[in-house]
Amino acid sequence: MQAKKRYFILLSAGSCLALLFYFGGLQFRASRSHSRREEHSGRNGLHHPSPDHFWPRFPDALRPFVPWDQLENEDSSVHISPRQKRDANSSIYKGKKCRMESCFDFTLCKKNGFKVYVYPQQKGEKIAESYQNILAAIEGSRFYTSDPSQACLFVLSLDTLDRDQLSPQYVHNLRSKVQSLHLWNNGRNHLIFNLYSGTWPDYTEDVGFDIGQAMLAKASISTENFRPNFDVSIPLFSKDHPRTGGERGFLKFNTIPPLRKYMLVFKGKRYLTGIGSDTRNALYHVHNGEDVVLLTTCKHGKDWQKHKDSRCDRDNTEYEKYDYREMLHNATFCLVPRGRRLGSFRFLEALQAACVPVMLSNGWELPFSEVINWNQAAVIGDERLLLQIPSTIRSIHQDKILALRQQTQFLWEAYFSSVEKIVLTTLEIIQDRIFKHISRNSLIWNKHPGGLFVLPQYSSYLGDFPYYYANLGLKPPSKFTAVIHAVTPLVSQSQPVLKLLVAAAKSQYCAQIIVLWNCDKPLPAKHRWPATAVPVIVIEGESKVMSSRFLPYDNIITDAVLSLDEDTVLSTTEVDFAFTVWQSFPERIVGYPARSHFWDNSKERWGYTSKWTNDYSMVLTGAAIYHKYYHYLYSHYLPASLKNMVDQLANCEDILMNFLVSAVTKLPPIKVTQKKQYKETMMGQTSRASRWADPDHFAQRQSCMNTFASWFGYMPLIHSQMRLDPVLFKDQVSILRKKYRDIERL
């Protein structure tokens, strides 16, 4: 055996050597013949070898450096590999590689902050209503500037929403019109809005002109063409989508278990051929006519009968049996398959209806995906796994379904219910990219009240806002600052403002008192103010207008603010109790004087009433506690037009603050126990008696209500019948057993 192994090894080694000499000889002969040919051609003057003749030759020589955005403009002398050509042609945008760092000029934003300029409308140019709403939302926002030299971002007045050449809204010659703009600068620092692009039959994402280095806020954009941290994916919305406000979500109360009549529904067009037809043509395989109702119709377009298949008549009959709105209101999940384009109107319809969207649109970059975690509000499916959808959603636990439905309502109302919210969300995302050091985190974007109402310029710490105490495991503040608004001169030591100051200072929760002196008379001398155990700071209002009481003064060192009118009559016990209530509801207004609103059918407008009833929707800031963040929000979020109106009327600032807080929280204020004589005492004071009795004052407040509701786009105030009283309040027990016993004695 050992001898056989040795013979086998020797035979293998010999074979290897033979092969080596054979192939080596071929290469040697080839090189010799090649050298002879070179020598022969050299004698005939046909070849002059270079000094690096003996260096090896590589198939692709190193190319000189060329900036990426100049590759397509170079002549053919610069070699571009086939792979690079494919990459360049794979995108419809020449600025495929654009990112904020490479195609955005940050220096324009450092000087004046984030300001947006809208080009003036050119004469003779038609603008669709949807694009007019977008421009109006920008011009009505706090970001707008009419001075291009102050702008950080530029938006075209040319309508770029519909770039389908078959659409009547299509704007012709857009390429030359855009290039002629003197501020265009190859699209740098420009934002282009687009809902529809491409046309039959392939519906590409080409917008029909060179966008250069401009950002796209685009619906139905694919992940392939989406430029991360540069473009913004927006939802597809209809021309009827409201400009401001918008309807609230359909989830009025939480039903347990959170299941509805239908498990999964869809009702829409079916395309027999072409792009987007595969998924919708296959839906009938999943439809069972019971809890999974997926309805399609071929009955659309001019020539639908010429192209209909064997299922069309049956599908059309079944389609007519069901009401779409009824299905939405009674379904747990709503299928959102792609159409001709990746996006669909069904997406926003499902969100509003609290019907959990089941996405079937492979490659779609979901709206605002940069900041929204869609796994908390939707089920992301795969078109190739359509038949597995029913079993997948049936396996979702009821607790998860309830959480998904609740999140759909939050996202709808925070970012999608109006064109204004879609536009503002787009702008806020871009602003966060520019000022990364104060940008919002994922918790802010995906938790109530959302990114539009939490301004990072106020603070980068979540604990400074009234909405995140529970998330951070923090207790609400234990101290407050009393801010007394003084408008009448100090002529007597018995004036109500001095009694109020002493009562507030005696509170165990009071950290300091600030007197905002908005009186035309000079400041009183320091000895005129009573001595207190807490600091008393007197601030003279520079403008002496009503809105100045809500300025974010640096002197306010506590998160809680006790806002007081100079003629308010409160005891220390009442102040203490109101503050302990506020600690349980730090995001709301908590206080004493309550008012209400109503809809006047005869006048078709909102009405204001001060009648004492069991129903209220406002707590006036003449005696109320709230978080100081609302001072900042009032000053920086609300438009100057509303604040100017308040200042001119010297009225309605308390109503506007209630509008703001209710719009943010989606909750009513909280009324606490009030002494019986409060109304009579307050009305008897000389400083404001004339105001409350003045019919013009009341008419102004009626007018304010409607102006404010018009700007918000809806009525944010919410009615409530809850009043919080101390434990054992009015109970037939000994007064000594009651903590806030003085309230009943008043």
Curated annotation (Swiss-Prot):
Entry's EC annotation: 2.4.1.225
Domain of life the protein comes from: Eukaryota
Broadest EC class assigned to this enzyme: transferase
Residues at which UDP binds: K267, K269, Y271, R280, Y319, Y324, R346, E349
Binding of a protein, residues: L166, Y203, H300
Residue ranges, Lumenal side: 29-746
Protein name: Exostosin-1
Protein species of origin: Papio anubis
Name of encoding gene: EXT1
